């Protein structure tokens, strides 16, 4: 429980804040400066060699229900050590989260754990609460994809979002391909063996560790040289001097020799433009072009970058350099209307910014009660509101039964002068 909650404390208990990511889950209490635990979003079952990913969108509902029930039980009774019936829940989610996943998650929380209420909070919007700003262009570089969403005066501009399958998963796939093609392994029996002869594939955890420990993002000039050598642009196949090689210990006596050329070239897939001229940098610029022209200047000067992939060394510097480089191209120069771009520095690590925003919002107990889906409402209707559905009930039906709107909400919706 939070440190300031004693046995004799009165009032409502602080909410539980859960950021359920595809790779890692952040969990803790509202009002605190960081999550209590950051754990892989997997469960382990007897008889299965590989752990099961909890966040899956392409499995049947009952199987997903079973995975989520087991995983959330671990969160409550192994890490948080609190009674789920006593505390509201704030769930940080992506705006592109499939409806069946949201519905299954809320069914687990309401029907199995019997929580008092649930708030489904968009991760991009929660990130702004940590900075105290109303408008920003928010880019979330996560495990599966990079998703950009402009927010103006606290309202997400949903028709201007953009996404690309460029994230940690794409980096791991590229890293594994290059390791299997180029790297050698020293074992107790022999040295210089090819990696495929020692292991057919590299485990996900090893790829994650190699990426975090050895890989980095080059500056713009060096990155363009690496891309030119890779694709033989203008007959140029000479790449810049690579960084030093790294010896990475595998299980037992095996030593993997990670080439320096791999350490900086892997991350270039985030900035290489594909056949449609799309990259992480163009994602932001294309989203800006879709926004109303009178909002572009404010959005461009308030870039917020979140997600674990953006924590790679040199990522933010390279992203800003790429944007300033691309904005001079004819595609954007005549139509964008602004050239000034600035990136905010949130008060938390990029992978925890959305969680911290949820912890800030969850600490506002009066507002949280009026914005959450109550257990009584869910038991009566058996459904949750969805932004992409036109068949949603009025807002007043979702308030806690028998609880009046807080003064702030009364003032916001009052017509009295």
From Swiss-Prot:
* Keywords in alphabetical order: Cytoplasm, Cytoskeleton
The domain of life for this entry's organism is Eukaryota
Q: What is its main location?
A: cytoplasm
Where found, per UniProt?
Cytoplasm, Cytoskeleton
One Pfam entry for this protein is: Actin
Cellular-component GO terms for this entry: cytoplasm; dynactin complex
GO terms classed as biological process: microtubule-based movement
Q: Which family does it belong to?
A: Belongs to the actin family.
Question: What does the subunit section of this Swiss-Prot or TrEMBL entry state?
Answer: Subunit of dynactin, a multiprotein complex part of a tripartite complex with dynein and a adapter, such as BICDL1, BICD2 or HOOK3. The dynactin complex is built around ACTR1A/ACTB filament and consists of an actin-related filament composed of a shoulder domain, a pointed end and a barbed end. Its length is defined by its flexible shoulder domain. The soulder is composed of 2 DCTN1 subunits, 4 DCTN2 and 2 DCTN3. The 4 DCNT2 (via N-terminus) bind the ACTR1A filament and act as molecular rulers to determine the length. The pointed end is important for binding dynein-dynactin cargo adapters.
Purpose of the protein: Part of the dynactin complex that activates the molecular motor dynein for ultra-processive transport along microtubules.
Q: What protein name does the entry list?
A: Actin-related protein 10
Q: Which organism is it from?
A: Mus musculus
